[in-house]
């Protein structure tokens, strides 16, 4: 595990160094929101000498009039709405560190994800999955498979309570195992600087026999407090139930997001397991970049 942490720390340090030199709010959706803010400020200069600065993270931007905070992944475990307005692209590198409770070596599941804004409240994500298995004698790194994901928001932001979004993911892992993962995504603002998200999840393999489907019913819930334009702190919770193995897993722990600029951001979420069926901990680290 020490080798894994040292490797991830070096990678994140390099990524941090490369992002500090870029400018603010480059996507077309964010530019639109900032342009409107500047116009409002100029038009009101003669009337107001000292005024409170608008809070950009909650500024409604883009074709769907969504708040700017939804244009990046605020919560590693919980998705909210669509992140990519029309004609925009995002990239994310994931490190999903799973530490078993029995003391065996950790497994680091990695994925490279590209998200595309298709318009009409649709988003398409493409993934490549790899895995690193730690072992003092023979650690290994290998290819796991591919998957794709489609999201559809039922309405523009704020038109329906919770901003419901339909999510479907199809996986092809180890070259032979197909899986599906439908979800319902919910999320919104709460209070002055609070945000929340809730996902209802079914994850299963495609198989004729129920025993081979390995179905898991789950939900994730997250709350975040936007401290400023760069920093968000919060907490996440996960529950998973496997209806074949009859196992339940409970997790809860802190999360944070730091935005380097309008392009890059870093998410860290650490959730210790709360019961014996759960892993000792699940830690997710994400580096994201908006083109």
Enumerate the language-model features and the residues they cover.
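Bacterial N-terminal signal peptides
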Residues: 9-19
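Transmembrane beta-barrel domains of Gram-negative outer membranes and organellar outer membranes
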Residues: 25-291
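Bacterial N-terminal signal peptides that target proteins for export
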Residues: 1-9
């Amino acid at each position: 595990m020490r080798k894994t942490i040292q490797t991830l720390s070096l990678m994140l340090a390099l990524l941090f160094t490369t992002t500090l030199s870029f400018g603010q709010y480059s996507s077309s959706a964010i530019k639109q929101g900032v342009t409107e803010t500047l116009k409002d400020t100029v038009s009101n200069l003669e009337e107001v000498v000292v005024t409170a600065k608008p809070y950009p993270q909650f500024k409604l931007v883009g074709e769907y009039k969504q708040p700017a905070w939804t244009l990046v992944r605020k919560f590693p475990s919980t998705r909210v709405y669509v992140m990519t307005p029309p004609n925009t692209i995002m990239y994310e590198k994931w490190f999903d560190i799973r530490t078993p409770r029995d003391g065996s070596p950790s497994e680091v599941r990695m994925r490279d994800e590209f998200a595309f804004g298709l318009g009409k409240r649709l988003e398409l994500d493409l993934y490549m999955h790899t895995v690193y298995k730690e072992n003092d004698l023979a650690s290994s790194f290998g290819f796991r498979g591919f998957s794709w994901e489609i999201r559809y928001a039922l309405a523009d932001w704020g038109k329906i309570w919770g901003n419901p979004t339909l999510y479907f993911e199809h996986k092809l892992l180890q070259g032979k195992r197909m899986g599906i993962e439908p979800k319902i995504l919910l999320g919104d603002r709460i209070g002055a600087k609070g945000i929340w998200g809730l996902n209802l999840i079914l994850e299963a393999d495609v198989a004729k026999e129920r025993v081979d489907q390995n179905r898991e019913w789950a939900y994730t819930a997250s709350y975040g407090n936007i401290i400023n334009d760069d920093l968000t702190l919060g907490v996440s919770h996960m529950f998973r139930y496997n209806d074949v193995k009859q196992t339940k897993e409970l997790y809860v722990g802190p999360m944070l997001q730091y935005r380097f600029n309008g392009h890059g951001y870093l998410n860290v979420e650490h959730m210790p397991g709360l019961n014996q069926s759960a892993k000792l901990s699940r830690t997710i680290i994400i580096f994201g970049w908006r083109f």
